[in-house]
């Protein structure tokens, strides 16, 4: 948290911006947007072996309750408006993780007429998790990278 100084009187001094960002990283609530086989790996990351709940990451069923969206799988042209609508319903500040090669750039179905070549054409993406499908460890690493990015942002100046 980049604590500036610990005083002998028994309290800590820091900036409000750093404290807010530190608290945000401890309670990230992702909205699952599972479209294909990458969603199975996302479910595995929330299951008992990896247990994302211990990191304060609790999957939420509603976009109004979440601040992170994990797009996992092939995004078709028909699902693109739904993705944008769910993204717009999320409260600020919000972040997006693109999981898998299909969500990142179209993947194996890149040349299909009905596939969007990356969900970053519809919503702004903060973290890309590569793989086909990416493992649960890769998703957890992507979430850790997002936490580091959140700590670096300037929240109050937004």
Curated annotation (Swiss-Prot):
**Highest classification ranks of the organism:** Bacteria, Pseudomonadati, Pseudomonadota, Betaproteobacteria, Nitrosomonadales
Which Pfam families does the UniProt entry name for this protein?
Oxidored_q6
Identify the cofactor(s): [4Fe-4S] cluster
* PANTHER family assigned: NADH DEHYDROGENASE, NADH DEHYDROGENASE [UBIQUINONE] IRON-SULFUR PROTEIN 7, MITOCHONDRIAL
Q: What is this protein called?
A: NADH-quinone oxidoreductase subunit B
Which organism encodes this protein? Thiobacillus denitrificans (strain ATCC 25259 / T1)
Instruction: Report whether Transcription regulation shows up as a keyword of the record.
Output: no
Top EC category: translocase
Identify the domain of life: Bacteria
Quaternary data: NDH-1 is composed of 14 different subunits. Subunits NuoB, C, D, E, F, and G constitute the peripheral sector of the complex.
GO:BP terms for this protein? Answer: aerobic respiration; electron transport coupled proton transport
* Record carries keyword Cell inner membrane: yes
What GO cellular component term, any one, is given?
A: plasma membrane
The UniProt note on the cofactor reads as follows: Binds 1 [4Fe-4S] cluster.
Family, per the entry? Belongs to the complex I 20 kDa subunit family.
Its record classes its membrane topology as: Peripheral membrane protein
- Reactions performed catalytically: a quinone + NADH + 5 H(+)(in) = a quinol + NAD(+) + 4 H(+)(out)
Any GO molecular function: 4 iron, 4 sulfur cluster binding
Give the enzyme's EC designation. 7.1.1.-
């Amino acid at each position: 948290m980049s604590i500036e100084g610990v005083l002998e009187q028994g309290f800590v001094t820091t900036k409000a911006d750093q404290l807010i960002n530190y608290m945000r990283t401890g309670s990230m609530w992702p909205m699952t947007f599972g479209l294909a086989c990458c969603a199975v790996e996302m479910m595995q990351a929330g299951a008992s072996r990896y247990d994302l709940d211990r990191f304060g990451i609790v999957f939420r069923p509603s976009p109004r309750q979440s601040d992170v969206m994990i797009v996992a799988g092939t995004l078709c042209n028909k699902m693109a408006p739904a993705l944008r609508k769910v993204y717009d319903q999320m409260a600020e500040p919000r972040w997006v993780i693109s999981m898998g090669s299909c969500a990142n750039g179209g993947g194996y179905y890149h040349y299909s007429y009905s596939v969007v070549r990356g969900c970053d054409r519809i919503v702004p993406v903060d973290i890309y998790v590569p793989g086909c499908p990416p493992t649960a460890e890769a998703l957890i690493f992507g979430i850790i990278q997002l936490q580091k990015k959140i700590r670096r942002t300037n929240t109050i100046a937004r």
